Amino acid sequence: MSVVDFYDELAPEFHLIYEDWNIAIDHQGVAIDRLIRSRLPDAQSVLDCSCGIGTQALGLASRGYKVLGTDVSERALDRARLEAIHRGLDIAFMACDLRELETLQGTYDVVISCDNALPHLLTDDDVAQALRAMYSKLLPGGLAVITVRDYDKELVERSVTAAPRVNPGTPRKVVVRLHDWDAPDGPMYTVHFLILTERSTGWSISHHSARYRAIGRDALTAAAAKAGFTNIRWHQAEDIGFYQPAMTALRDGE
Protein backbone atom coordinates (compact mmCIF):
# COMPACT_ATOMS: atom_id res chain seq x y z
CA MET A 1 0.00 0.00 0.00
CA SER A 2 1.40 3.41 -0.98
CA VAL A 3 1.59 6.30 1.46
CA VAL A 4 -1.12 8.08 -0.53
CA ASP A 5 -3.43 5.05 -0.37
CA PHE A 6 -2.71 4.63 3.34
CA TYR A 7 -3.80 8.16 4.23
CA ASP A 8 -6.63 8.27 1.69
CA GLU A 9 -8.15 5.17 3.28
CA LEU A 10 -7.55 6.34 6.85
CA ALA A 11 -8.81 9.91 6.34
CA PRO A 12 -12.41 9.31 7.53
CA GLU A 13 -11.22 7.56 10.71
CA PHE A 14 -7.76 9.02 11.37
CA HIS A 15 -9.08 10.87 14.41
CA LEU A 16 -9.60 7.49 16.10
CA ILE A 17 -5.89 7.23 16.87
CA TYR A 18 -6.49 9.94 19.50
CA GLU A 19 -8.47 9.48 22.69
CA ASP A 20 -10.21 12.78 21.89
CA TRP A 21 -9.14 14.43 18.64
CA ASN A 22 -10.61 17.85 19.49
CA ILE A 23 -8.63 17.94 22.72
CA ALA A 24 -5.53 16.79 20.82
CA ILE A 25 -5.94 19.63 18.32
CA ASP A 26 -5.97 22.15 21.15
CA HIS A 27 -3.15 20.58 23.18
CA GLN A 28 -0.89 20.14 20.16
CA GLY A 29 -1.62 23.67 18.98
CA VAL A 30 -0.57 24.98 22.39
CA ALA A 31 2.61 22.88 22.41
CA ILE A 32 3.73 23.75 18.88
CA ASP A 33 2.87 27.43 19.39
CA ARG A 34 4.95 27.50 22.57
CA LEU A 35 7.85 25.81 20.78
CA ILE A 36 7.66 28.26 17.87
CA ARG A 37 7.52 31.28 20.19
CA SER A 38 10.52 30.02 22.15
CA ARG A 39 12.65 30.25 19.02
CA LEU A 40 10.87 32.77 16.78
CA PRO A 41 8.67 35.05 18.90
CA ASP A 42 7.32 37.15 16.03
CA ALA A 43 6.34 34.28 13.71
CA GLN A 44 3.05 34.77 11.88
CA SER A 45 2.94 32.43 8.88
CA VAL A 46 3.18 28.63 8.90
CA LEU A 47 3.48 26.02 6.17
CA ASP A 48 2.36 22.63 7.49
CA CYS A 49 3.84 20.45 4.77
CA SER A 50 2.43 17.10 5.98
CA CYS A 51 -0.85 18.32 7.41
CA GLY A 52 -3.00 15.21 7.01
CA ILE A 53 -6.51 15.84 8.30
CA GLY A 54 -5.29 19.06 9.90
CA THR A 55 -4.43 18.32 13.53
CA GLN A 56 -1.60 20.87 13.87
CA ALA A 57 -2.86 23.25 11.16
CA LEU A 58 -6.20 23.64 12.92
CA GLY A 59 -4.57 24.14 16.30
CA LEU A 60 -2.15 26.78 15.03
CA ALA A 61 -4.74 28.65 12.95
CA SER A 62 -6.94 28.90 16.04
CA ARG A 63 -4.02 30.71 17.68
CA GLY A 64 -3.81 33.35 15.00
CA TYR A 65 -1.23 31.97 12.59
CA LYS A 66 -1.79 32.27 8.85
CA VAL A 67 -1.52 28.63 7.77
CA LEU A 68 -1.12 26.77 4.50
CA GLY A 69 -1.53 23.01 4.82
CA THR A 70 -0.16 20.63 2.20
CA ASP A 71 -0.22 16.86 1.95
CA VAL A 72 0.00 14.04 -0.60
CA SER A 73 -3.45 12.68 0.34
CA GLU A 74 -6.36 14.41 -1.38
CA ARG A 75 -8.86 12.69 0.90
CA ALA A 76 -7.02 13.86 3.99
CA LEU A 77 -7.02 17.38 2.57
CA ASP A 78 -10.75 17.18 1.88
CA ARG A 79 -11.31 16.20 5.50
CA ALA A 80 -9.03 19.02 6.70
CA ARG A 81 -10.96 21.58 4.64
CA LEU A 82 -14.27 20.45 6.13
CA GLU A 83 -12.83 20.54 9.65
CA ALA A 84 -11.54 24.08 9.12
CA ILE A 85 -14.91 25.25 7.81
CA HIS A 86 -16.68 23.59 10.74
CA ARG A 87 -14.44 25.53 13.14
CA GLY A 88 -14.68 28.83 11.26
CA LEU A 89 -10.95 28.84 10.47
CA ASP A 90 -9.47 30.38 7.32
CA ILE A 91 -6.85 27.84 6.22
CA ALA A 92 -5.69 27.14 2.68
CA PHE A 93 -5.04 23.51 1.77
CA MET A 94 -3.45 22.07 -1.36
CA ALA A 95 -1.86 18.85 -2.57
CA CYS A 96 1.94 18.75 -2.62
CA ASP A 97 4.61 16.16 -1.88
CA LEU A 98 6.92 17.47 0.84
CA ARG A 99 9.87 16.74 -1.47
CA GLU A 100 8.42 19.16 -4.02
CA LEU A 101 7.63 22.20 -1.90
CA GLU A 102 9.70 24.40 -4.22
CA THR A 103 6.71 24.32 -6.59
CA LEU A 104 4.65 26.31 -4.08
CA GLN A 105 4.56 30.08 -4.20
CA GLY A 106 5.68 32.15 -1.26
CA THR A 107 7.88 31.70 1.80
CA TYR A 108 6.98 31.37 5.47
CA ASP A 109 8.20 32.19 8.94
CA VAL A 110 7.78 28.55 9.97
CA VAL A 111 7.63 25.21 8.16
CA ILE A 112 6.43 22.21 10.17
CA SER A 113 6.22 18.47 9.57
CA CYS A 114 4.74 16.61 12.52
CA ASP A 115 3.29 13.20 13.40
CA ASN A 116 6.27 11.16 12.19
CA ALA A 117 5.68 12.06 8.53
CA LEU A 118 9.32 12.39 7.46
CA PRO A 119 10.17 8.71 8.14
CA HIS A 120 7.77 7.69 5.35
CA LEU A 121 10.72 8.66 3.12
CA LEU A 122 12.73 5.47 2.78
CA THR A 123 16.09 6.67 1.46
CA ASP A 124 18.71 9.22 2.48
CA ASP A 125 18.22 10.99 -0.85
CA ASP A 126 14.48 11.40 -0.27
CA VAL A 127 15.02 12.77 3.24
CA ALA A 128 17.66 15.17 1.93
CA GLN A 129 15.33 16.33 -0.84
CA ALA A 130 12.52 16.97 1.65
CA LEU A 131 14.77 18.93 4.01
CA ARG A 132 16.08 21.07 1.15
CA ALA A 133 12.49 21.68 0.07
CA MET A 134 11.49 22.74 3.59
CA TYR A 135 14.52 25.02 3.76
CA SER A 136 13.55 26.63 0.45
CA LYS A 137 10.14 27.69 1.79
CA LEU A 138 11.50 29.51 4.82
CA LEU A 139 12.04 33.23 5.00
CA PRO A 140 15.56 34.24 6.07
CA GLY A 141 15.77 33.56 9.78
CA GLY A 142 12.79 31.19 9.56
CA LEU A 143 12.21 28.10 11.68
CA ALA A 144 11.64 24.45 10.80
CA VAL A 145 9.87 22.15 13.27
CA ILE A 146 9.94 18.38 12.72
CA THR A 147 8.48 15.80 15.10
CA VAL A 148 9.20 12.08 14.81
CA ARG A 149 9.00 9.03 17.02
CA ASP A 150 11.82 8.63 19.53
CA TYR A 151 13.83 6.40 17.21
CA ASP A 152 16.95 6.40 19.36
CA LYS A 153 14.79 4.53 21.86
CA GLU A 154 12.76 2.55 19.32
CA LEU A 155 15.83 1.20 17.54
CA VAL A 156 16.87 -0.37 20.84
CA GLU A 157 13.51 -1.55 22.14
CA ARG A 158 11.92 -2.53 18.78
CA SER A 159 8.37 -2.28 20.10
CA VAL A 160 5.89 -4.38 18.16
CA THR A 161 2.61 -2.89 19.32
CA ALA A 162 1.04 0.17 20.89
CA ALA A 163 -1.71 0.09 23.50
CA PRO A 164 -5.12 -0.48 21.85
CA ARG A 165 -7.31 2.61 21.65
CA VAL A 166 -10.98 2.03 22.50
CA ASN A 167 -13.38 4.65 21.16
CA PRO A 168 -16.66 4.31 23.03
CA GLY A 169 -19.26 5.78 20.63
CA THR A 170 -21.83 4.11 18.48
CA PRO A 171 -20.64 1.91 16.95
CA ARG A 172 -17.75 1.09 19.27
CA LYS A 173 -14.35 1.04 17.57
CA VAL A 174 -10.99 -0.30 18.71
CA VAL A 175 -7.73 0.77 17.06
CA VAL A 176 -4.75 -1.60 17.23
CA ARG A 177 -1.33 -0.62 15.88
CA LEU A 178 1.37 -3.16 15.08
CA HIS A 179 5.02 -2.48 14.18
CA ASP A 180 6.48 -5.16 11.92
CA TRP A 181 10.28 -4.70 11.75
CA ASP A 182 11.99 -6.08 8.65
CA ALA A 183 15.08 -7.16 10.58
CA PRO A 184 16.20 -7.12 14.23
CA ASP A 185 18.97 -4.62 13.49
CA GLY A 186 17.58 -2.66 10.52
CA PRO A 187 15.69 0.64 10.24
CA MET A 188 12.83 -0.47 7.99
CA TYR A 189 9.41 -1.45 9.30
CA THR A 190 5.73 -1.60 8.41
CA VAL A 191 2.98 -0.12 10.56
CA HIS A 192 -0.34 -1.95 10.49
CA PHE A 193 -3.49 -0.16 11.67
CA LEU A 194 -6.34 -2.52 12.49
CA ILE A 195 -9.69 -0.85 13.13
CA LEU A 196 -12.28 -3.12 14.72
CA THR A 197 -15.89 -1.93 14.47
CA GLU A 198 -18.68 -3.46 16.53
CA ARG A 199 -21.68 -4.50 14.43
CA SER A 200 -25.00 -6.10 15.33
CA THR A 201 -23.68 -9.30 13.76
CA GLY A 202 -20.23 -9.15 15.37
CA TRP A 203 -17.01 -7.26 14.72
CA SER A 204 -15.63 -6.13 11.36
CA ILE A 205 -11.96 -5.36 10.77
CA SER A 206 -10.30 -2.92 8.36
CA HIS A 207 -6.55 -3.04 7.77
CA HIS A 208 -4.26 -0.20 6.64
CA SER A 209 -0.47 -0.38 6.38
CA ALA A 210 2.43 1.92 5.53
CA ARG A 211 6.19 1.69 5.32
CA TYR A 212 8.60 3.67 7.51
CA ARG A 213 12.33 4.03 7.97
CA ALA A 214 13.53 4.80 11.49
CA ILE A 215 15.95 7.72 11.56
CA GLY A 216 17.85 8.59 14.72
CA ARG A 217 18.59 12.07 16.01
CA ASP A 218 22.22 12.18 14.91
CA ALA A 219 21.33 11.13 11.37
CA LEU A 220 18.47 13.63 11.08
CA THR A 221 20.60 16.40 12.57
CA ALA A 222 23.37 15.71 10.06
CA ALA A 223 20.90 15.66 7.17
CA ALA A 224 19.37 18.96 8.28
CA ALA A 225 22.79 20.59 8.56
CA LYS A 226 23.69 19.36 5.08
CA ALA A 227 20.47 20.91 3.77
CA GLY A 228 21.62 24.28 5.11
CA PHE A 229 19.92 24.48 8.51
CA THR A 230 21.78 25.94 11.48
CA ASN A 231 21.25 26.17 15.24
CA ILE A 232 19.66 22.72 15.28
CA ARG A 233 18.13 21.67 18.60
CA TRP A 234 16.24 18.66 19.92
CA HIS A 235 13.41 18.98 22.43
CA GLN A 236 12.21 16.12 24.62
CA ALA A 237 8.51 15.32 24.32
CA GLU A 238 7.88 15.79 28.03
CA ASP A 239 9.65 19.17 28.01
CA ILE A 240 7.44 20.65 25.27
CA GLY A 241 4.14 18.97 26.16
CA PHE A 242 3.98 17.07 22.87
CA TYR A 243 3.69 13.34 22.32
CA GLN A 244 6.85 13.10 20.21
CA PRO A 245 10.31 14.69 20.46
CA ALA A 246 10.87 17.63 18.13
CA MET A 247 13.80 18.96 16.15
CA THR A 248 13.93 22.69 15.48
CA ALA A 249 16.35 24.38 13.09
CA LEU A 250 16.86 27.81 11.58
CA ARG A 251 17.50 29.17 8.13
CA ASP A 252 20.18 31.81 8.49
CA GLY A 253 19.15 35.43 8.03
CA GLU A 254 20.29 36.84 4.71
Residue spans for each PLM region:
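Conserved class I S-adenosyl-L-methionine
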Residues: 1-52
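Class I SAM-dependent methyltransferase SAM/SAH-binding core
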Residues: 55-100
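A short acidic, Gly/Pro-enriched loop at the edge of an enzyme's catalytic core
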Residues: 102-110
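A short SAM/SAH-binding and catalytic strip from SAM-dependent methyltransferases
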Residues: 109-125
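A short glycine-rich, Lys/Arg-flanked "PGG" loop and its adjoining helix->strand segment in the class I
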Residues: 128-140
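SAM-dependent methyltransferase
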Residues: 145-219
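C-terminal lobe and adjacent flexible extensions of AdoMet/dcAdoMet transferase-like proteins
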Residues: 211-254
